[in-house]
A protein has these predicted regions:
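An N-terminally biased module of ancient metal coordination in phosphate/nucleic-acid-related enzymes
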Residues: 1-68
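Active-site neighborhood of phospho(di)ester-bond hydrolases with catalytic His/Asp-centered motifs
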Residues: 2-4, 37-40, 72-76, 129-131, ...
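Non-catalytic positions within long, well-ordered alpha-helices that form the structural scaffold/packing
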Residues: 30, 122, 180-181
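A structural motif
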Residues: 34, 154, 184-185
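Active-site environment of divalent metal-dependent phosphoester hydrolases
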Residues: 44-47, 78-81, 135-139, 164-167, ...
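Extended substrate/RNA-proximal surfaces in nucleic-acid metabolism proteins
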Residues: 49-158, 236-244
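Short acidic/histidine-rich active-site segments
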Residues: 184-200
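Mid-to-C-terminal alpha-helical segments outside catalytic/metal-binding sites
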Residues: 202, 206-244
Length: 244
């Protein structure tokens, strides 16, 4: 399996607090058959930036050589009006050198403003992956409009493991499952902030995915869609949610 959203890098955001915790996260991820983790520290201008991230990422990779888990670098970028300037400045916020960008939607903005932001980002030739939209009540209260938005702007959707098993409450769980039911989600990721998340939340969510989804779709959510992103083999081109 591949995990495209994890706060694995220590001491840069609200994720792993130290190198030992990061190594423990990798160890447990390997136990649960995760072969690749994309480390996605928060990038939120004025709150979290990527200063020092590369150095800690390289240290972590060097310390984790005994584990059979590939570690790649990305970011979880907060989508506000400043994001367009960040993209224009060509700061290293994407998944490696790809055009894919994992974005977190603002929780207090109107759906109309969020949709406008997404269209502007897409117009900058960015392939958008929306992180855990099921947790954003303002967005999910405009559920049908959101589905039209991801179709029109050609966005991909990443669900959190915790959402699927009810960590964030009944509304979020049911919304996540509705997205799964209509196959509007493209990835399920850990959004792990500590070793415990890999030990408990992620395996429980994987089990639930296989209960809720047919095997082909489950594999896409957990592995094959993510693999096509990191190998730049394809992208979602239509609402059918197929990659390639």
């Amino acid at each position: 399996m591949l995990d495209i959203h994890s706060h694995l890098i220590f001491g840069v955001d609200d994720g792993s607090s130290c190198l030992d915790e990061s190594i423990r996260m990798i160890e447990i991820a390997e136990m649960h058959n995760i072969s690749t983790i994309i480390a996605t520290p928060h990038f939120h201008n004025g709150i979290f930036n990527n200063n020092g991230v590369l150095e800690k990422f390289e240290l972590l990779v060097n310390k984790a050589v005994d584990y059979h888990v590939e570690i790649r670098l990305g970011n979880e970028v907060f989508a506000d009006d400043e994001i367009l300037n960040i993209i224009k400045a060509k700061k290293n916020i994407n998944f490696g050198n790809s055009q894919y960008l994992l974005i977190e939607l603002p929780y207090s903005d109107s759906f109309e403003h969020i949709a406008n932001l997404i269209y502007k980002i897409a117009a900058a030739n960015i392939k958008i992956i929306i992180a855990h939209p099921e947790r954003n009540r303002k967005v999910m209260k405009s559920f049908h409009e959101f589905i039209k938005l991801i179709h029109t702007a050609n966005c991909q959707v990443q669900l959190d493991a915790g959402s699927i098993i009810g960590v964030y409450g009944a509304f979020v769980k049911e919304t996540a499952r509705q997205l799964l039911k209509i196959k509007a989600a493209d990835f399920m990721a850990s959004n792990a902030h500590c070793a415990r998340d890999y030990m408990t939340l992620y395996p429980a969510a994987v089990q639930k995915i296989y209960q809720l989804c047919d095997e082909e779709y489950a594999i896409k959510l957990l592995e094959s869609n993510a693999r096509k992103i990191i190998t730049v083999e394809g992208s979602i081109s239509e609402y059918g949610r197929e990659i390639g």
